[in-house]
Each structure stands twice: as structure tokens, then as C-alpha cells.
A protein has these predicted regions:
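FAD-site-proximal beta/loop scaffold in flavoenzymes
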Residues: 255-279, 306, 312-322, 391-393, ...
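Conserved beta-strand-loop-beta-strand element in the redox core of flavoprotein oxidoreductases
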Residues: 217-233, 393-426
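Internal hydrophobic alpha-helix adjacent to the cofactor/substrate pocket in enzyme cavities
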Residues: 291, 297-307, 336-351, 484-509
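Glycine-rich FAD pyrophosphate-binding loop
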Residues: 170-186, 307-321, 325, 355-362
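N-terminal Rossmann-like FAD-binding beta1-loop-alpha1 element of flavoenzymes
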Residues: 147-173, 288-295, 341-342
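Residue-level detector of alpha-helix initiation sites
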Residues: 90, 155-156, 180, 285-287, ...
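Ferredoxin-type iron-sulfur electron-transfer modules and their immediate structural context
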Residues: 1-148, 196, 237-253, 393-398, ...
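N-terminal Rossmann-like dinucleotide/flavin-binding domain of flavoprotein oxidoreductases
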Residues: 80-89, 122, 185-233, 368-381
């Protein structure tokens, strides 16, 4: 066979001129650009395109699925999958538990009957594998740059930025205002969703790269922002948005009215929070759902404490009844029945009323859909199309929420239908505690105000640079978003900072167009059952802050990895070789994964059969059919 293949990296401009259709991740051009020649095009899968942290999802799934094909042990394949995953996201176990997985909404498998690949479950499994194996993050260079970078905040954005910069040989110091790391991951997400030991282990892995950590250190109090800029070659601001928004209605300054951010912070910090028997949560976002479900668990703890005290009284009464039994069995039988009924009643919590008020319908709720469903299953009551207009107070404490019914009108700027008050529909919801989960804003430290916009968010350009040279920012401090978005911001900001420290011009990263399901042969893929994580029973979940779900088992993970359709990259299905009428295609596993197929162009007649047979959209004809 005459080898005429070359591997080229093609610029966006050249590629658009030649293809006129899509931007590829990488093209393997074989035998020139004739329209008759099969061209192997490694394209961006839609899952990665939808992932805010740009994880190589296809890469780590197919590494596991094809382990046997490349004669790797399962352990070796999982180790490699972990390395691929953590190249972009150093907190896989964490995000495998909390991420709303937009990647799954992008997955092309959703267009089949068996649904999207359970990417989030796989991320959690791979992350846990890394922790169980005590795998360590590796530096990209052993040479230190001599440059120092200050990272303000140890939330997902700050941790991600510190991780990437440390791998590149820079000396990184994290300044954290709280007593522990994690930002909203620790102080805003309940432990039943994210256990503290999981977060601690992944943060420690980042620190083990040589990152210095200074907790209980607030910029503006312990060190000025100006001094910080002088002492470090670059500064990344990842402060997050820890201040809960308020509604500006009468009575919200009452002692028993909290924002969701402050409420969750207190609970997660271990502070005792008394909420009483009737809790009202205002809002339909993630913080509101977390606050509602945490309230239910706090009430269960109070109920358990009371039940324990009453159980002691029950035991004493039962002993007295047993003594009576020696003389009057009939009377004692009645007393026993009454006592047992009373004890059963104690098991039903009277501290179980948590009500969520939301001004639109459930379909418009911005919270993670899964969390809304779980909240309903746990017994949380939803008052939809309901807006608070005031707070009823008595002696400086809130006793109720004044509400009005709403109806939906025309869509607003967000695309959701605008809620309109219904005249004469006012009513009051009684409460012992009110929690407002309507949003959060940053608390900028002294000296940072000049970097903010008129709404109080830090302003950055597309490379995450502020108007001040050497100062960069990302994560919730520039606008609220999900945690993986903050991880992506931290990584991209680190890329900018690295170029800045080296005096390099940063080339703009161009977004590739993902392969669509309509460009694939979907009929090739047989139905395969999706592998779901197991949940603990609701009655147990609502009485504990222990994790409510279990990581999938190895057999499930292996099966789930094989559900990946490897969109845009060869997975050695052999269809092209089987159907080639000229027997011009051969396969060799000595080549890298994804590039095992090879065309002998001395035999190829350009019939397009390989292109039509390829299920994953990898084979194009020439420079675009």
C-alpha cells in the first residue's frame, strides 16, 4: 500500500473556505482534497459543546467502552478516563453530584427511544474512582515560571483557575474569606447533595500541586487590594455572589426572615438555626429548593428530639401498665393500645410544613427539575402562581406572608410569560420563618468597585480580563450561573493569565459546530437501557443530611459508557470496512484511539459508501460532500 496520508491542523479561515459548512476540531486529510476522497474529520460532539467546562466527555466515555479493544485493564482505562476528565475539571466527584448536566441536553442519543447518556452519573463514578484510587493531579511542566498569582476566593472559579495555573508552573496563592474552602460549594449546597469529605478530598488534590491557601483572609480587611496587586504578578477575582437578594417589602427586616444564601451558610457552617413548624420559602431557583429541603430536614431533627423525649415517657408508662397487667388484663389491653397509638402518632412529624411560593408555574421554575421533583416527593408544598407582596409582623417577628394570586401574560425578556396579579385574590400564608431565595449578588471588597458595572457585577472582556491590567475575574462575580460554568471561567481565565505572564498574544478560541444527529446514521445504534443512580427511601432522606443518592456500580458504568455513540469520532465499528466494495479500508489498533481506520487510496474509487455507512459522522468526502 502506498502511504499518502498527512495530519494537518487547519485554521478556521482556511477550513471555512474549503468546507463552507462547519468548523472541525481536527482533520486527517488523506490524498489531497478531491471530492472523491474519504476524509476523516474529528468533530466536536454536542455533549462537549453543551458542557460549560468543555470536558472531553466523548473521550473519557469511549476510553472506558473500548478498553478491551485496546487491551487495557478496566482499572487502567478508568485511570485514563479520570485524567481526561480532570484535564478540564478538577472537581469531577463534586460536579457529578450537583451539576444540572446541560451536556445531557446536548447528547444526540436523546433522539433515540432510550434517552441521553447518563453523563452526570459517569462523571461522578469516574471522580469517585480517582478518589478511591488516590490518583493525583499532574503538572504540565516541572519548571517554575517565577511568576506569582493571587486567586481571591476558593469557589469553583478560583479553584479551577488555581489548578490550571499551578499545572503550568506558576506560584499560586488562594485568599479565602471564610474558614474553609469551596465557596458556594461548601456554604451554599447542602451536605445531602454534596458530602463535605468529597469536596475536601478534591480541594486537597488541587492544593497538593503546591497551591498556597490562606483562609480567614478578607481583602480590604487583612490585606488591601492595592497591596495585593503590588505583591503579585496577576490577580484573579473569583469572589462569587454570596449576598442574598431581598424583595424590598415591608417586614423583611424581621429577625426570622433570612435570605436563602445566609440561611444555607449558617446551616452548612454548623450554626443552630431555629425555624419553627411553618416555613415559607420564596422563589423557584436552586437556592430556594435547597433551602426548602434543608428546612424539612431541620424540622425532622427537631421532631426526632421531641420524639426521643416522649419515648422516655412512653417507656415509663408502659412499665406501669405491665405492672397493672398482673391484676386487670382487660383494662391493661386498652391502655396498651392507646399508648401504642400515641407512640405511632409521634412518628408523624408535626414539624413538616414547608411551603414554596413561586409566581409562575412549575414549568417556568429555573431550579434543577430533578430537585423540584424530589422536593415534591419529600412532601414540600408548592403554592404556584403566587407572589408575596408584604410580610405580616408581630413584635418584630414575621407571622405570615401577604400574597396575591398571579396569572401568566405575554412573554418577557427572558422568554417566560410575565406574571400578572389577579385583582381581589389576596391571602395570607402563616409562618414561623421566611426564607427568600430570589437571587444573589456579589459583595465586592474595598478597591474593587471601579471594576464593577452599574449593577455591582465585575466587568470583564471575552478573555476574562478586567479594565485593570493584570486583574482578571470569572465565576458568579461576573454573573450568576451553574458551578461548571465557573469552572470553565477559571480555566479560560488561567489561559489568559498564562499568556499575560509570558508576554504572549492570546489567540481567540473559535467555537466549532457540533455534529448533529441528522448527520449521523442513528439507525445503527440499538436501544440500551440508561443506568440510573439509586436513591435512598424518601422517609429516610427527609430525616437525615446524609447523601440521598448512591454512585452507580462498575457494571452500570461499563454499560453506560457503551451507550455513548462517539459522535464525530471513529469508534472502530467496522461499518466502513465491511461495506467498502473495493476492500480499500483496513484497521489497525496500533494507531491511536479514534484513528484506527485507514483508506488505501490506490484502491478507493470514491463511491461514497464508507461515508454513508459511517454511523457517527466521522467520514466526509473530500473537503465536504
Amino acid at each position: 500500500m502506498i502511504e499518502t496520508s498527512i495530519l494537518t491542523q487547519i485554521s478556521r479561515e482556511d477550513l471555512e473556505a474549503k468546507l463552507g459548512r462547519f468548523v472541525a476540531e481536527e482533520i486527517v486529510v488523506r490524498n489531497g482534497s478531491s471530492w472523491k476522497c474519504p476524509t476523516y474529520v474529528q468533530r466536536i460532539p454536542p455533549c462537549r459543546d453543551a458542557c460549560p467546562s468543555s470536558e472531553d466527555i466523548r473521550g473519557y466515555l469511549t476510553t472506558i467502552a473500548q478498553a478491551g479493544m485496546f487491551k487495557k485493564s478496566h482499572e487502567q482505562a478508568l485511570d485514563e478516563a479520570w485524567e481526561l476528565l480532570t484535564d478540564k475539571n478538577p472537581l469531577p466527584s463534586t460536579h457529578g453530584r450537583i451539576c444540572p448536566h446541560p451536556c445531557e441536553s446536548g447528547c444526540n442519543r436523546q433522539f433515540l427511544t432510550d434517552g441521553s447518556v447518563a453523563i452526570n452519573n459517569m462523571e461522578r463514578f469516574i471522580g469517585d474512582h480517582g478518589l478511591n484510587r488516590k490518583l493525583k493531579y499532574k503538572k504540565l511542566t516541572d519548571k517554575m515560571s517565577g511568576k506569582k498569582v493571587a486567586v481571591i476566593g476558593s469557589g469553583p472559579a478560583g479553584l479551577s483557575c488555581a489548578y490550571q495555573l499551578a499545572r503550568k508552573g506558576h506560584k499560586v496563592t488562594i485568599f479565602e474569606a471564610f474558614a474553609k474552602t469551596g465557596g458556594m460549594l461548601r456554604y451554599g449546597i447542602p451536605s445531602y447533595r454534596l458530602p463535605e469529605d468529597i469536596l475536601d478530598a478534591e480541594v486537597q488534590n488541587i492544593l497538593d500541586l503546591g497551591v498556597e491557601l490562606k483562609c480567614n483572609t478578607r481583602i480590604g480587611r487583612d490585606i488591601s487590594f492595592e497591596d495585593l496587586k503590588k505583591q503579585f504578578d496577576a490577580v484573579f477575582l473569583g469572589l462569587g455572589a454570596h449576598k442574598g437578594s431581598i424583595m424590598n417589602i415591608d417586614g423583611e427586616d424581621s429577625a426570622n426572615v433570612f435570605t436563602a444564601a445566609s440561611f444555607l451558610n449558617r446551616v452548612n457552617s454548623g450554626a443552630k438555626v431555629e425555624i419553627g413548624s411553618q416555613v415559607v420559602v420564596i422563589g423557584g431557583g436552586d437556592s430556594a429548593m435547597d433551602a426548602a429541603r434543608v428546612s424539612l430536614r431541620l424540622q425532622a431533627e427537631l421532631d426526632a428530639a421531641e420524639a426521643s423525649g416522649n419515648a422516655d415517657a412512653y417507656d415509663q408508662a408502659r412499665e406501669e401498665v405491665d405492672r397493672k397487667a398482673q391484676h386487670d388484663e382487660e383494662t391493661v389491653s386498652i391502655e396498651k393500645t392507646a399508648l401504642d397509638s400515641a407512640r405511632s402518632a409521634l412518628r408523624v412529624s408535626k414539624y413538616s410544613k414547608v411551603t414554596v411560593l413561586y409566581r409562575r408555574t412549575k414549568d417556568e421554575m429555573p431550579a434543577i427539575a430533578k430537585d423540584v421533583v424530589e422536593a415534591e416527593h419529600e412532601g414540600i408544598h408548592f403554592e404556584l402562581l403566587t407572589a408575596p407582596v408584604g410580610i405580616v409582623t408581630d413584635g418584630g417577628r414575621a407571622t405570615g406572608v401577604q400574597c396575591v394570586r398571579m396569572e401568566l401574560g405575554a412573554p418577557d425578556s427572558s422568554g417566560r410569560r410575565r406574571p400578572i396579579p389577579v385583582a381581589g385574590s389576596e391571602f395570607v400564608v402563616a409562618c414561623d420563618t421566611i426564607i427568600m431565595g430570589i437571587g444573589q449578588v456579589p459583595e465586592l471588597e474595598q478597591g474593587m468597585e471601579t471594576l464593577a458595572d452599574k449593577w455591582g457585577w465585575l466587568s470583564v472582556d471575552k478573555a476574562f480580563a478586567t479594565a485593570t491590567p493584570g486583574v482578571f475575574a470569572g465565576g458568579d462575580v461576573i454573573g450568576l450561573g451553574i458551578s461548571t460554568r465557573s469552572v470553565g471561567h477559571g480555566r479560560l481565565a488561567a489561559r489568559t493569565i498564562h499568556a499575560y505572564l509570558n508576554g504572549e498574544n492570546l489567540n481567540a478560541a473559535h467555537k466549532a459546530r457540533p455534529v448533529k444527529h441528522s448527520e449521523m446514521r442513528m439507525s445503527f445504534y440499538p436501544p440500551m437501557k440508561r443506568n440510573e443512580e439509586k436513591q435512598i427511601p424518601v422517609e429516610e432522606a427527609t430525616r437525615t443530611f446524609k447523601e440521598t443518592t448512591h454512585t452507580i456500580e462498575f457494571e452500570q458504568a461499563l454499560a453506560e459508557s457503551k451507550r455513548c455513540m462517539s459522535c464525530g469520532l471513529c469508534f472502530a465499528c467496522d461499518q466502513c470496512r465491511i461495506y467498502c466494495p473495493r476492500e480499500a479500508i483496513e484497521r489497525s489498533f496500533k494507531r491511536p484511539q479514534g484513528k484506527v481506520m485507514h483508506t488505501d487510496y490506490t484502491r478507493c474509487n470514491g463511491c461514497h459508501v464508507c461515508h454513508l455507512a459511517c454511523p457517527c459522522g466521522y467520514i466526509q468526502m473530500g473537503m465536504g460532500l
